[in-house]
Amino acid sequence: MAKRLMDEYQDEYEMVRVFANTGCEANETLDFVHACDVEFGFNTVWIEAVVNARGIPTGHKIVTYETAKRSGEPFEEVVEKYGIPNKGYPHCTRELKENPIHSYVRSMGWKKGEYLTAIGIRADEPRRVKRTISTQNKQIRVYPLVDMFPTDKLDVLDFWSEQTFDLQIPEHMGNCKTCFKKSDKKLQQVYQDNWHHFDIFAYLENQYGYVGKNMIKGVHSDKPRQFYRGYRSVRDLIASFDLSEPLPKDDPEAYEGCAASCEAFMGDEESPAWGAEAESD
């Protein structure tokens, strides 16, 4: 998407490409973003969240491929303030990606509601498309791979088959490695690749489980927050894995994948009434 927009619309729009690093992505993801810069000349701006005192929204700082954190530091800073994110408290996207990106854009002098946010959802993912304008930040989302040049997953695979490089990880390792939005199957695949990938989340649960309020099935609870569906901890999740037989490999042409559930930007409807409080500017 970014390549076609740059090639076909650069003269029509002022474009900025931003990568918000959470510190929990696979190293290969960062390598890939850097390779795109080198090969395509994207001049991507790398940023990380800057968590401020209570009452002040999350800001940003500019980093580089070389200085970007790779051991979960930005993620931990968000958890220290807002608590463990999970299905009921999905503030990780808001505080690690959405707010830092909007903070950077504002620093350029762009104002809310006066710029477009291009999102790389494909034409074969219609359920992920959100046409409404966010009431929280007046964000206007556009979907070039749906409306401007309809593109499905096979088209994307064809494009990368013609390039000299690609994202060198399987689908289950996309986004934050142990994201709670991934299916149990994909999380088991992550575990079988390297069980140490879960160390960060296990540490965060132990360290910050009691930060923030907690509700389970709509009822206030004194129990600590935990990451995974069904109110499961990292330990509970791992105990549920059936390791007796190897899982089948991902089909690269399958339309389902972990990326299908991890949104770059939240819609207003995705913020539950009992979610963590968000500061606004």
Feature map (PLM): residue ranges:
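Nucleotide-activated chemistry modules centered on ATP-dependent adenylation/adenylyltransferase
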Residues: 1-281
